[in-house]
Amino acid sequence: MSQIIRDMTEIARCGAQYKADRLSPMGLKGCHASYLTEICAHPGISQDQLAKRICINKSNVARQAATLEEEGFLTRTPSATDKRIMELHPTQKTLDLLPEISSVLKEWETCITGDLTAEELDLMAALVAKMKSRATDYMDGR
């Protein structure tokens, strides 16, 4: 494995632990931040659409959505056009917590990028976007 991939993987693992530590007092797991921020940004998103947007397999999304529903963070309702499709909506509980969740994500970003210059941040953002595009192209082609 290349050093770049190792480093990116390690950063992702550290970020997951950071989110888990900060979100657990809210009753959330670290992985739930990406689910809830997307659901709040796109109320009514289907489980399949969410899986594609956050690059998680459909069965994991279904499992986590069920957990989040049980805990009162979202509702799952069958689509009016296709009862097999489950649409996800944030609850008021989630909407109330969204600023805190967003703050945790911003804190992590600041933690790992705080000593980078504006030019370094711009370059990194462009390079990461390029890599993400290739990664999502792979996922779309599966």
Which functions belong to the PLM regions below?
Residues 16, 66-129, 136:
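Charged, amphipathic alpha-helical coiled-coil/dimerization segments
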Residues 1-26:
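N-terminal leader segment of winged-helix/HTH proteins
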Residues 47-48, 59, 66, 86:
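Residues within helix-turn-helix
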Residues 9, 37-41, 102, 129:
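Short, locally clustered residues in the helix-turn-helix/winged-helix DNA-binding domain
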Residues 7, 14, 18, 34-37, ...:
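Pre-recognition alpha-helix immediately N-terminal to the DNA-recognition helix
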Residues 31-33, 59:
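Key DNA-contact positions within bacterial/archaeal DNA-binding proteins
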Residues 43-44, 55, 117:
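Central "turn" residue of the DNA-binding helix-turn-helix
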Residues 51:
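The alpha-helix within a helix-turn-helix
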